[in-house]
A protein has these predicted regions:
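Sec-dependent bacterial lipoprotein signal peptides
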Residues: 1-20
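Intrinsically disordered, low-complexity peptide-like regions
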Residues: 3-4, 8, 35, 43, ...
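Generic signature of intrinsically disordered, low-complexity, basic-rich segments
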Residues: 10, 34-36, 40-42, 50, ...
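Bacterial Sec-dependent N-terminal signal peptides
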Residues: 17-73, 435-436
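Mature extracytoplasmic or organellar-lumen-exposed domains after removal of signal/transit peptides
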Residues: 62-436
Length: 436
């Protein structure tokens, strides 16, 4: 194996990290940097930058391990991948969201599903009832842990509003200030909205993409604080397994992060080549973003980063692992940003029609509402913070869903406020309003 290198340039200072390599991976660094130092690479070629200048750096990075084509990892003939707990929580969350569309559901039932206790008959699936897992204690408890209580209150408030306001008006036609049903033009889908035009089930569904899925993955399981906890680094170096298991702690943590996204995939080993799932959370919208020509390749890129990071964990290549985690954070966060802007733009375009289809507008804006809420759980790997803080997100929501001063949410939102919010989101995530 040859001695090869990574080149990283931060704030104009170049540093070299040498790795043993057996596989070549091309990485394009597109950011512009100001170079003020002389950088010399001496192996077979020499690159010298001697002037202060703005340059775009493109380099070939060689890594010291193979990246498998699928998410299949074994040890002594046994799989080392396990994320059944994540699949369980996704199933619980999905059934809870479904219950929000059944007007016979009580608030006690919804809250019990959210805060499931082992053995309670909260779900239609006996295995879920027998489980000690629950959704509530994994909601908003990582990157936004200081806001965890407020986040759970938000979710429970939407559930309560659905039961108290929407269910009693299930057969009433909605109007400004009054909950009820509203049908899309041409005999399309019937939507059930609250007094301000919001579909509470969509708010809960899309908010959980951030508060449960993204938060657990990006701000929890794939962070150095989690992966390196205890003696994990030393244990991974010698591949010390968890008692009675085929995997190490670090491998399992990485897989648990993977499970929150791919836990309901039809083929969890190869969900890109063999797409399909009954997921209603992150994985579903990865597929939707990937189908947009402006973001084609997103699904493959994200899954490859998961495979690369997992392979790096096996080899105890922790810098490569963290680089893959950063790639995952950027790509998964982008999915949330793209869909938030997309739905706000769709609502704005709908309102601009000569005869707006308000049911369609409300549906788009309800989905957008939940995705905007989820932005507080994203992670910008360059800053180590979300792309928008909770305070910034709540301020944005107050503009796209105004409910003060007698205003009635989506009934009164303006096209300009929707376009401004969509543009602000697009700019932060590095795309344009037109791309959305």
């Amino acid at each position: 194996m040859n001695l090869l290198k990574y080149i990283f340039i931060y704030g104009g200072i170049a540093s070299l990290i040498f790795l043993l390599s057996c596989e070549e991976e091309t990485v394009t660094v597109t950011e512009e940097v100001i170079v003020t130092d002389t950088v010399t690479i001496t192996e077979t070629d020499t690159l010298t930058i001697t002037e202060t200048d703005t340059v775009t750096v493109t380099d070939t990075v060689l890594i010291g391990f193979a990246i498998p084509a699928t998410y299949l990892f074994t040890r002594d003939g046994d799989t080392t991948v396990s994320y059944s707990g994540q699949t369980t929580r996704l199933k619980m969350a999905k059934e809870m969201v479904s219950a929000l569309k059944d007007e016979t559901t009580t608030i006690a039932k919804l809250l019990a599903m959210f805060d499931h206790q082992e053995g309670a008959s909260d779900f239609s699936d006996a295995d879920l009832n027998a489980s000690s897992k629950q959704v509530k204690n994994k909601t908003g408890n990582n990157g936004t842990a200081t806001n965890a209580a407020a986040i759970r209150v938000d979710l429970e408030a939407w559930m309560t509003n659905q039961v108290d306001s929407v269910f009693p008006a299930w057969t009433d036609e909605a109007s400004k200030g009054l909950a009820g049903y509203i049908q899309e033009a041409g005999g399309g889908s019937t939507r059930y909205v609250n007094q301000n035009g919001l579909e509470n089930n969509q708010a809960v569904n899309k908010a959980l993409i951030g508060a449960l899925v993204a938060d657990q993955v990006l701000n929890g399981y794939l962070t150095p604080a989690k992966l390196n906890s205890g003696t994990n680094e030393a244990d991974q170096a010698v591949q010390t397994k968890v008692d009675g298991k085929s995997y190490t702690n670090m491998e399992h943590y990485w897989d648990e992060g993977y499970g929150y996204i791919y836990g309901l995939a039809t083929d969890g080993i190869d969900p890109v080549t063999t797409p399909g799932s009954n997921d209603i959370f992150m994985l579903k919208y990865i597929g939707k973003v990937d189908s947009d020509p402006d973001f084609s390749g997103t699904a493959g890129e994200l899954h490859r980063a998961f495979r690369e990071g997992r392979a790096a964990v096996v080899e105890a290549e922790f810098e490569a692992r963290d680089a893959a985690a950063h790639h995952i954070a950027k790509t998964a966060s982008l999915v949330i940003g793209v869909r938030a802007a997309h739905y706000l733009k769709a609502g704005q375009i709908g309102l601009a029609a000569a005869s707006p289809d308000m049911a369609g507008v409300f549906h788009d804006l309800s989905e957008g509402f939940g995705f905007v809420y989820s932005i507080q759980f994203t992670l910008n790997p360059e800053t180590g913070a979300p792309y928008f803080s909770r305070e910034e997100v709540m301020e944005m929501l107050s503009k796209i869903y105004p409910t003060t001063g007698g205003m009635r949410g989506f009934w009164d939102v303006t096209q300009s406020d929707l376009q401004e919010a969509a543009t602000t989101i697009a700019t932060a995530f590095g795309f344009t309003y037109e791309n959305a």
